[in-house]
């Protein structure tokens, strides 16, 4: 995935803080093209996961906010790609202007769930963790949030992986018997298959 995506990740309601997120190769220099840091940081020298203060510009180059910028380089980011985030005041007008400036520089609007999709495709999380992100966002109780958080931490994936591995072993043995009937392969007996399936079902 070579394109750069951008989106408001905190919603567009009036709030104290709003976050605009970018992901994709080249997103860090793109972020700096609409941001003037107060210090000496550049797209090449900025440290990962360190907030830097500066001026955020709209597509006409006007300063629209005093904001913070943080970056994470691939593969050590949420999506597994280079990422950047602007932490600015949560004015819908500011957030929209920031996005428009980024789109004018070559970014595109991220699709729904696209950051998490990229994290999954880049191996940063498994499918159960990707689903847990949605569950956590939509949680309506502390219990639901706790369950989703556990799943996000990989609890479900840890249960599924050994089951998948065991069933894959059984299937591979069947394929070997069918594909190489003349080879000296120990045949699986029905009771062993039933035991393996029962063991997995009990998980």
Residue ranges, per PLM feature:
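A glycine-rich (often HGG/GG-containing) alpha/beta subdomain
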Residues: 1-146, 150, 154
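C-terminal-of-GTPase-core extension/linker across diverse P-loop GTPases
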Residues: 2-12, 54, 144-203
